[in-house]
Amino acid sequence: MGLSCRRMLARCVAVLGACCVAVTAQAWEPSKPVQFYVPAGTGGGADQMARTIQAIVAKHGLMKQPMVVQNKGGGAGAEAFLEVKEKKGDAHLLLITLSSLFTTPLATGVPFRWTDLTPVKMLALDEFVLWVNTESPWKSVAELVAAGKTQKLRMGGTGSRQEDHIITVAIGRATGAQFTYVPYKGGGEVAVQLVGGHVDTTVNNPIEAVSHWKAGKVRPLCVFDSKPMPYPEKITETMSWADIPTCKSQGLDVEYLMLRGIFMPAGVSAEQVRFYVDLLDKVRATPEWKELMAQGAFNQTALEGAEFRAWLEREEERHRQLMAEAGFLAK
């Protein structure tokens, strides 16, 4: 190879190298504030998780643009779902989801499915715990069920035909206990209503009731999971999350876990999805996130890509069956 050819080849290599650097430098990232929708009211588990993510991203400088959390809980989340559905291709919009992702369209017939969105990542699964006021006479599942067979107990929850309501119906079917379901705007409000004695019992998520448990205002009876929660640190002087027995071990054969996942509108690119997957992985590695997981006793299952989509397919069908059994499907 002559000198001139070698020089030309060297120049080509240099140009290609520069192009690669330019492509790397131009990897997609948000160019304006990212709107972060919560399809539920303030103070509940989804709201707390979204605001924790927002704070972690800001504190650790994980993204150049800020996150702006907005609560859009109208219609049991339908307000948020339909708005995100309409914003195809908007990569500056995130949605944190509950299992209302399935229950709301199935119960109301609203024209929406999770397939109208782009799944980004499952962050965790949220537990449900059966709670009573500490001033109540019920110290076990058996005592609560016995009371529910002689009188209708008021069960507080976060929405008609939603997750809490499904569990309430399942408890009644499994035990013969009777409940009057009283819906509120969010899990935070439900916990306050239990503390105030306005309802007899709830099936709140741990993070929604933990402050009241620490204060000695509410008592956990069981967790609706197949195994105890793996968090041994004491929350009260005598109990940790791990000390709460499973409902099945107490004779109540009902299990239910709730999705905590992140979605984007349809029509976004794989590169844009990858940006947020990587961002959320960085969030999950922080001490603040680990503290949230322990405080809220979350099941830390995390999925993305094809695994997440397969899980969503299965859960949608499971919810269809559960809601059919409860008589909750839209007609």
Feature names for model-found ranges:
Residues 125, 209-285, 314-317:
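C-terminal lobe and pocket-closing loops
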Residues 31-33, 214, 270-331:
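An extracytoplasmic/periplasmic, membrane-proximal ligand-sensing/linker region
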Residues 20-24:
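N-terminal signal peptide c-region/cleavage motif recognized by signal peptidases
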Residues 73, 145, 156-160, 164-243:
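Ligand-binding pocket segment of bilobal, Venus flytrap-like solute-binding proteins
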Residues 27-116, 152, 176-205, 212, ...:
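N-terminal (or domain-start) structured segment
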Residues 83-92, 105-189, 247-249, 259-292:
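Hinge/capping helix and adjacent helix->loop/strand transition within the periplasmic-binding protein
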Residues 1-16:
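Bacterial N-terminal signal peptides that target proteins for export
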